[in-house]
Every structure is written in structure tokens, then in C-alpha cells.
Amino acid sequence: MCGLVGMVGERDVAADIYDALTMLQHRGQDAAGIMTCSDGKLMQRKGEGLVRDVFRSNHMAQLLGRFGIGHARYPTQGSSGAALAQPFYVNSPYGIALAHNGNLTNSAFLSDELFQSDLRHLNTDSDSEVLLNVFAHELHRLGKLMPLPEDIFTAISTVHKRCEGGYAAVALIAGFGLVAFRDPHGIRPLVVGQRVAPSGVVEYMVASESVALDVSGYELIGDVLPGEAICVSEAGTLYRQQCAENPKLTPCIFEHVYFARPDSLMDSISVYKTRMRQGAALAKKVLRERPQHGIDVVIPIPDTSRVAGQSLAYELGVKFREGFMKNRYIGRTFIMPGQSERKKSVRQKLNPVPLEFQDKTVLLVDDSIVRGTTCGQIIQMAREAGAKQVYFASAAPPVRFPNVYGIDMPAADELIAHGRTVEEVRVEIGADWLVYQDLEDLLACSREGNPAVDGFESSVFDGEYLTGNIDEHYLQSIQAARADSAKRHGDALGVSDGAVVGLHNDS
């Protein structure tokens, strides 16, 4: 899961891209990068770490240009390392840079095809580099000295035919401008906004979430539709066209559960309101299963579950309290690359307030239970703080299946609910009672925000994958490639480390 930004402005855009990336930091903490274009030359700065650590004032001063793209990365395809920081770049044709959020499920096939048929070299194991080279090759086939918007749209139409999976991308083409596109299923989010400069010039931004627009005063004007492509020329003219044959709006439901910020709008759905509805639906299930629940207090696991927890407590008519204090300098445990890092992080990240636990029946609320690492330790912390009984509620259904569209849930045997009943999960995490949201209720909570959606990508809950190329062989291959043990081994060997091949300048 990653954060994307693309901008075309009246003046240098690097500072606004930086600000937007800080608003998307929750989507990826492994690496960050910005690439801009000025007078036909591309400039870049990228590296491992948080946005604030990768960029310094001397770097920003070198990132000149009125259009550019930015990326905050969390690795889902390929290992971690400086060589995989985005954007990626190819010099032919034109000079193209691209940043990508999602996962190509036919990446291995495309890699072979690019080498054997398209005569293109790939330097990493990242599917983002694959996507860039497919796009570049399709533009090159058109043979234009400089592409027109209709050429961009033609190339992206073929990209949609060749590439399978869930993806949103922003790209810049030297001497042309900004390009953004989204997969035909609309799995990964991408929004577009505009801002009127003091001179009257209209400036444009595309981003993974609407909060990235807010920080620089951009007005949300809508979403990049499934299968759609947007071009903004260097002169600031916006073009958009549907490039897929049969697009359907089926966004990833886990964005609403966990990844997106609550103050974001995506696909016309308020994440905040959706999580409020999740809490209300969960309260109804609690009352169905335990009318005499005896709950004294509802306590959220910071931060994602706070909104659902407030709604849940209100509907139950019990107190809502902040029973855990969060260390703001520890990253999100779900998106930490290794299991050992996640385990170590929980107690560093959260500390209980004993007053809220002593001699009480406590209902802890979290957005979901993935590996069970966090909730098991938190339940133990609640008991140590004096809780009489510890109940646990998940605002999402049991996560039983791997995600193949850009969220790091790679290995089924690492998912605590895979192959287990709810009762078995309860015993494993040590709760006195465990309640999950029903899938039908979860989907209804999001659909209420936009009845026009065709459905939701919910494969982590039901095992039904939108793209037809997902079989047991594929799932086993990604389990082997992306399991925590394999990822640690690959990083230790430096599989994806080494020199970053790309642009080299003072940034």
C-alpha cells in the first residue's frame, strides 16, 4: 500500500508535493521520492525512510519544475531497499517517470514478455517498474516525436489489456506533462483536485486520498474513474478519457476499514461516516449476541478504530474512554515489514491508563484482526492494568485470505483467522469474548456512502478475487515470495539493495 501525488502548477511544485506526501505518510513508511521536470530535464530525490527524513532544504531547492510526482512506499511486491524507492524512470521514449500503488498479479509473465518481446531491461523485482515499462513500450510503439493526449490514452488502453491486478499510477513525461490512471476495477483509490492561483491559472493535483489536496488548498473535483486516464499538459490543460472496455467501480473495502484517513473522501464515500456506520452495525450485533453484555467501558485501539469505537459505545449506551496512550513516534504496526518488529512495537507504541481498566468489564475495539500480534498483546496489557474481563470487537470480519492487490497480507498461515473458527481465534488471542463484524454489514456501511458502486473488493474476507487469474499456484507463489521469513532473508542478503539506477543530480 502506497501514497501517490501528482501536480501541475504555475510555479515549482516540489514543496506542495512534499506537503501532500506528509499527509499520506500513513500509507507507507519504507521510502519516499519526488521527481519533477523543468525545461525538459527530470530531477529526483528518493530514499529510505519517512518523508521528513528523506528530504532536506538542499534537496528541495534542486527539485525545480512546474509539474512532478511523489510517492510514499510500503513494500508489497519486492523486498525493501533504496533501489525500490519510487518514482522509477526510463529514458525512452521521451523520458518517463512513474509511481504506482497496488499490485500487478501477472507481473512475472509481463517481466518475461518485456524482456523477450519488447526488448526492455528490468533492474528490480518491483511490479511498479514492470508497469512503467509496459506504459513506455506502448507509447514507443506509436512512434511519435512528442505524444498528444490521444496517444497517451491509446497507450493506457493497451496497458489495461496487458496488466492485471489493482493499480493506480501517476507519471510524468518530459516536455509533455502529468498522466494519471486507475485500473478498470477501481480497486486502488485516486482522486483529483484543482486550485486557482492568484494569477487565475488553474492548477491540478491527483492523489491517493483527498486529505493530500486539503493541505495545499486544493478543491476535490472528483475521482479518477475505474479505467480512466487523466492528462494535464505542461501548459495546464486537463484532458480525461475512459480507456477500459468494461470498467466497474469495485474499490478495496480495506481502505475504509484501515488504510485511509478518516477525514478522506474516496469514490464519493466519506471514510469517517463509513466507520461511524461500522460501529453502529457492530453494536447491533453485540446486542443480538449478548443482550445482557455487562460492558462497563468501550476502549479503542488507537488510532484507526477510534471513530467506530465512539459509535459503538454510543449505540450500546456505555462509556467511551481513551484507555491507551499512544507514542506518536512509533509507526503503524500493521505496515511494519517484519513480525518481530510488530511484536516489539506494540508495547513501545501503547501504554494503558490503569484507571480505565481496574475492576471493569472492558470492550476493546480494533479496526480488524490480521495476524493477531497486536490484539493478543493488548489484551494481556488490559489484564495487567486490572481489567476484570476483556472482550474484543473487530469492526471488520475475520481476515482469512491473502490480499493480491497491493496490501501486505501475503501468507495465509500468518493470518490468525485462516483455518480457525471465531472461538479458536478467541482462545488464541486470550479474550473472554470475541465479536466480529458481519461481511454483509461491513459492505452495507460503505455502500450507503455511494449506492452507485458496483461492488467492493473484499477478497481478504471471502476469498473471491476480482481478476480471474488468481489460483492456488499464484497464492502459493506470493506466499513464498512475500512471507515475513522470506522477506527478512531477502533483505539480509541485499537482494534489492545496491545502487539506485535512475537520475543523478544534486538532489
Predicted feature locations:
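A conserved beta-strand->alpha-helix junction
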Residues: 55, 129-134, 320-331, 428-446
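Extended, hydrophobic alpha-helical segments in both membrane/secreted and soluble proteins
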Residues: 298-301, 305-312, 316, 320, ...
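Amphipathic alpha-helical
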Residues: 134-150, 302, 310-332
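Short, glycine/charge-rich flexible loops or terminal/linker lids adjacent to PRPP-binding catalytic cores
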Residues: 314-362, 373, 400-410
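Phosphate/diphosphate-binding loops
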Residues: 158, 211-212, 216-220, 227-228, ...
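Conserved short alpha-helical segments that host acidic/polar catalytic motifs at enzyme active sites
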Residues: 1-226, 231-296, 301, 389
